[in-house]
Amino acid sequence: AYEILRCLVGLGDVYKRQTLAGAAVPVMLGCALAAADGWFQIVPAMLCFLFAFLMQIDANFINDFFDYLKGSDREDRLGPERACAQGWITLEAMKRGIALTTMLACMVGALLLFYSGAEMIPVGLLCILFAFLYTAGPYPLAYHGWGDVLVIIFFGFVPVGCTYYVMCHDWTWNVTIASVVCGMIIDTLLMVNNYRDREQDALSGKKTLVVRWGAATGRMLYLFLGLAAA
């Protein structure tokens, strides 16, 4: 338990400004759309925020664990330090941390069903599933160039649209447009990180779009995402 707590503190310093903000903004947008249509509710809104935060922490733990196992967290890595690679936590403790955050996210998701209905069960299950498939398994999606697509889905359509749906039980064109824009903006953060890490990713076998198509194309994709979202 102590090791998990130490990991939470360490990862909080590393990730809180980036990934947790990225988890909060789409939910805020969904809440704003619901409020504009006169359907905002504080309790489901807070549950949506909590679910998003727990899923993001869970994804951070999962990525930290499996990237370490795959050898992606090299000594020459330029990005934020990772808990497993730095020896802040044992692999067994990280497994327990993943299990704990997954369980807590499922509990919060179950509470959300009282407001959304059973139709949100597949969405919650997909959130859990793809949190693992991103870096785990025989075909880790982040290692095969699918990261950008997943960001647009799980930082756009899912948090924006589902937050709105939980309160309004509806889906509008405004929600669709806002979801796409939000997902593309947050994907620029992934694109920047992949551009920064392109040499290390190539050595580690992580074939992001920047690695596959080159640095020049990566810069153009970043520009396209920003302009299209605007």
PLM regions: where:
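Short, small-residue-biased leader/transition segments that mark boundaries at the very start
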Residues: 1-14
